Amino acid sequence: LTGDAADVTTTTQAGFVLMGGSTDVDAAFQWMIARSGGGDFVVIRATGADGYNPYVYTDLGGVNSIETLVIKGKKDADDINAYNTIINAEALFIAVGDQWDYANYWKDSKVEDAVNYLVNVKHVPVGGTSAGLAILGDGYFDAKKGSVTSSEALSNPYGSKVSVQFNNFLDI
């Protein structure tokens, strides 16, 4: 956690940042921060560290706090503390990673419930980059059998590596 550990409640505006996975775009994060009303910003991922904390809190500023949760398995995805941290967020960002980890660990869990709450009840800005973007839709490539190139998928959309799911994860 970077910033104030005390929870704040701000007026938020819903919206989505769908980022490709290369360089982070300051303007996109600033847009999320503005729509969060300067509240608590949460980043979720399955691997990695808290590199977004100094970027959002110090470099961009304007948030009460930022916390990164590394949710690396089913047990972590059903942790009540992770759930509470997520539902208390005024902005949520899903970091780069492996979308199979996200689908496998987070689907049918408290993390999924918390993200759906933020989107559909609390109406906060939500963003994702790379794998975090890939799962923010009704249909998504889950990468269950590894990566597939565009040329492979287009030449054989029914190939063994093409694993696509529909309407069974996040309710966005």
Model-identified regions with their sequence ranges:
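Class I SAM-dependent methyltransferase SAM-binding "motif I" and its flanking Rossmann-like core
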Residues: 104-172
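Extended, subdomain-level signal for the structured scaffold at the beginning of enzyme domains
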Residues: 1-101
